[in-house]
Regions:
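A composition-driven signal for long, intrinsically disordered, charge-rich low-complexity tracts
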Residues: 1, 16, 30, 84-87
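Intrinsic-disorder/low-complexity, polar/charged segments enriched in Ser/Thr/Lys/Arg/Asp/Glu/Gln
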Residues: 1-5, 60
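Compact, glycine-rich, soluble single-domain proteins
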Residues: 7-57
């Protein structure tokens, strides 16, 4: 298991478009990808779960990856969040 805490820089937070971009990008990885926020963990491969988390701009989230390609999954997930999630 690997993890990293990152700050959400997207001005609108994790709304439909960024949640979709994130989910589509991490789904091909075999590893589980979870987002830790406000004491809860959310499935990073589920658009609905990401939207339900109500993650706002400036929030610190923990990206947690566990599986055979966890390092690559974490690198991709961190890159997406740090780049603004396509917005």
């Amino acid at each position: 298991m690997v993890s990293k805490v990152v700050k959400v820089t997207n001005e609108q937070g994790m709304h439909m478009r960024p949640a979709t971009v994130f989910s589509v990008a991490v789904t091909p990885f075999e590893s589980d990808v979870k987002i830790g926020y406000n004491g809860m963990q959310y499935d990073g491969k589920s658009v609905m779960m990401l939207m339900a988390a109500c993650i706002k701009c400036g929030a610190e989230i923990e990206i947690i990856c566990n599986g055979s390609d966890e390092e690559a999954a974490l690198a991709k997930a961190v890159e997406l969040v740090e780049s603004g999630l396509g917005d």
